[in-house]
């Protein structure tokens, strides 16, 4: 199939577009123009590639997880090690690209939102590198959950604004960042952290993250002598690491693509963030996408053990893949993610982020189904240092509950 998305209005099939007030339309049109110019300028990509190599540490390895594969006794599992990037996750691929773009546009200040803190840290890092002023909007709940990342951002010279509106999580941070952008449009660039928001943001983020899939595709051939894996697996919140892995394979129809959504306490409870499992189309943050909403169209609260996945929408390109059945999106509960977190740590000596642990948990199930003749690439989107204290507290609390039950 020839895949040519988005169209000129930023639609991926029936999803996407730019649903923004007039005050923001000028800024998104200016951004699109600057991005098109940078795409046509070989020096932009050359400079970015050099930074990705020398500063970020790309390319990241494609690692055959032999112990995990043998432990499961199913399909071969290859991990795309985005956890080994500078700052510890895939977020730097996009942050660096967008700060470099903003610098070329003559902007002086950078604003961003963050959930788990990884995009905030990546943006603060890139802003420090390019000597730009940086403000990060972060939900008050996430500020508490991710105190270490808050300190890292401040250490890097960024100002962290705790958002006290709404449920004080990622979607509220996006709202606050958009408001700030409207008020400071002339000298400020807003760096969206996921493949969300009004066009051209989903396309820009996808393009900067597609380095993941491009590298993985070539590395798989070099490692195995085979053309393509049978499946790809990535966790999905807004969906930037997943779209970065999936997009370079989208026309390879023999490759199945799976996004692992946060099912929280279960998709039949009110505590989850499984947007494609339980949501329906709606407009959120300037884009038409699948959204968790009630019967009256009010946005529901998303819930996940992982701060980076509790977003009530999903990038429009993922909604499109789901709609045309090019990718499958599967729910993974908090409990399953915790098992994945511990399993990978124990058998491979790699502590994954809680976000990535959702992908690991589903990969374990899929490997058993596919059997030993097949193979898959799993995006290990980030490292778990930021989550170790939270997991420790959770496991200790669970153990105490079990103890009480047996008493």
UniProtKB/Swiss-Prot annotation:
This is Tryptophan synthase beta chain. PANTHER family: TRYPTOPHAN SYNTHASE, TRYPTOPHAN SYNTHASE-RELATED. It catalyses: (1S,2R)-1-C-(indol-3-yl)glycerol 3-phosphate + L-serine = D-glyceraldehyde 3-phosphate + L-tryptophan + H2O. It holds the Pfam family PALP. The lineage of its organism: Bacteria, Bacillati, Bacillota, Bacilli, Lactobacillales. Belongs to the TrpB family. The beta subunit is responsible for the synthesis of L-tryptophan from indole and L-serine. GO terms for cellular component: cytoplasm. One of its GO terms (molecular function) is tryptophan synthase activity. The modification N6-(pyridoxal phosphate)lysine is found at residue 91. Its cofactor is pyridoxal 5'-phosphate. Its EC number is 4.2.1.20. It comes from Streptococcus pneumoniae (strain JJA). Pathway: Amino-acid biosynthesis; L-tryptophan biosynthesis; L-tryptophan from chorismate: step 5/5. Tetramer of two alpha and two beta chains.
